[in-house]
């Protein structure tokens, strides 16, 4: 090889390395992740207090949730799992000097980013770096001493595996008639039952009126019969 006038193949020609991800794709993914903790999940508007989060760890402006609950048609990306304010928890957030939301962990002093995932505690809503809560021994909020269970630590913008766990938590809460905020779920009014009750009430009312009329008629007949008997006795006495 090489003595016949040909050229030897180089290593790069023989070994194919995996293609590198273009820098633009990396920047795009980072910008998407960044928008998830800086923009409202249903309106894409910048997040501003009061900020709330659902059981799936997404962030919303509370004003947007209120608007959605009043008129779902006004919010194209309306999440079906949010049926009332009980299905969200208001987060305890701080503002920086410029008035923007500051996601700062009081334990690690890290700022929430695509590098540091954050989570919040239900029901108090205090926000921490997720890894710090995992390492924290006591199940008591570092800020307010609220006792909590591990399942009520909600990762913000969860990955696929975390999302499965959160979905199961919501299902378990629904079976126990509770909401994401751990408040009791509102019972839906049974329209058919209400109609039946109204129908029965009307029927009972009609029956009562009919019974009253019947009693009055019977009372009238009794009065007439008593009067006729008295008159007959008077006639007999006169004849005698």
From Swiss-Prot:
Phenotype seen when the gene is deleted: Increases intron retention in a subset of pre-mRNAs, including rtf1/Replication termination factor 1. Decreases replication fork arrest at the RTS1 replication fork barrier. Sensitive to methane methylsulfonate. No sensitivity to hydroxyurea.
Name recorded for this polypeptide: Splicing factor rtf2
Described function: Putative splicing factor that is required for the correct splicing of a subset of pre-mRNAs. Required for the correct splicing of rtf1, a replication termination factor that mediates site-specific replication termination at replication barrier RTS1.
Keyword presence, DNA-binding: no
Region annotation (Disordered) ranges: 1-22, 181-240
UniProt-listed GO biological process terms: mitotic DNA replication termination; mRNA splicing, via spliceosome
Composition bias type Basic and acidic residues, residue spans: 211-224, 231-240
Alphabetically ordered keywords of this record: mRNA processing, mRNA splicing, Nucleus
Superkingdom of origin organism: Eukaryota
Subcellular location: Nucleus
Record's keyword annotation contains Cell membrane: no
């Amino acid at each position: 090889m090489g003595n016949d006038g040909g050229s030897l193949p180089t290593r790069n020609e023989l070994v194919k390395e995996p293609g590198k991800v273009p820098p633009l794709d990396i920047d795009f993914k980072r910008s998407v992740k960044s928008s998830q903790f800086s923009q409202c999940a249903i309106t894409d508007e910048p997040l501003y207090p009061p900020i709330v989060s659902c059981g799936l760890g997404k962030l919303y402006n509370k004003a947007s949730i209120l608007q959605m609950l009043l008129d779902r048609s006004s919010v194209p990306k309306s999440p079906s799992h949010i049926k009332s304010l009980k299905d969200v928890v208001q987060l305890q957030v701080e503002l920086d000097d410029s008035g923007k939301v500051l996601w700062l962990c009081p334990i690690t002093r890290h700022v929430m980013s695509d590098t540091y995932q954050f989570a919040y505690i239900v029901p108090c809503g205090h926000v921490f770096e997720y890894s710090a809560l995992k390492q924290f021994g006591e199940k008591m909020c570092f800020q307010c001493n609220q006792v909590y269970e591990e399942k009520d630590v909600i990762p913000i913008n969860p990955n696929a595996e975390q999302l499965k766990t959160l979905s199961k938590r919501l299902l378990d809460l629904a079976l126990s008639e509770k909401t994401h905020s751990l408040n009791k779920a509102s019972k839906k009014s049974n329209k058919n039952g209400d109609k039946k009750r109204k129908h029965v009430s009307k029927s009972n009312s009609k029956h009562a009126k009919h019974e009253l009329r019947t009693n009055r008629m019977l009372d009238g007949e009794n009065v007439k019969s008593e009067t006729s008997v008295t008159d007959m006795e008077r006639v007999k006495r006169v004849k005698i």
